[in-house]
């Protein structure tokens, strides 16, 4: 199985006060097996660094970088994927949809997730 991990999942795993912390940890324990591939994008990593640093501090960023990221395959966004994400964002014209979301959907579509 291939699973895409987004910023909200990373944050829930790190923030003990997050209402989804326990649920996120349980899901990670179930899917963190050699047969599965966990994927995120470099855009999600940047977004996660920013959110974690702002809300939880640099120690949490360090934990994320040193403990979590080594478990995840990072898809590096190329120009074509970026442009597809921008097009999707502008076409959708929805305030709560971000470029990171649109690029994530494009990656998942390309990988058949």
Question: Predicted segment positions?
Answer:
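Acidic active-site catalytic centers that drive phospho-/nucleotidyl reactions
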Residues: 6, 47, 101
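Active-site neighborhoods of divalent-metal-dependent phosphate/nucleic-acid chemistry enzymes
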Residues: 74-113
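Short, well-structured N-terminal submotif of metal-dependent ribonuclease cores
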Residues: 1-39, 53-63
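Short glycine/serine- and small hydrophobic-enriched flexible loop segments
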Residues: 50-53, 109
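Helix-adjacent hinge/juxtasegments
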Residues: 52, 59-76
């Amino acid at each position: 199985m291939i699973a895409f991990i987004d910023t909200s999942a990373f944050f829930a795993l790190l923030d003990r006060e997050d209402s989804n912390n326990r649920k996120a940890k349980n899901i990670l324990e179930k899917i963190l097996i050699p047969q599965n591939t966990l994927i995120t994008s470099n855009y999600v990593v940047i977004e996660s660094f920013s959110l974690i640093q702002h809300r939880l501090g640099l120690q949490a960023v360090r934990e994320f970088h040193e403990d979590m990221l080594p478990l995840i395959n990072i898809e590096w966004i190329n120009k074509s994927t970026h442009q597809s994400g921008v097009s999707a964002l502008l076409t959708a014209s929805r305030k709560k949809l971000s470029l990171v979301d649109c690029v994530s959907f494009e990656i998942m579509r390309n990988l058949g997730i």
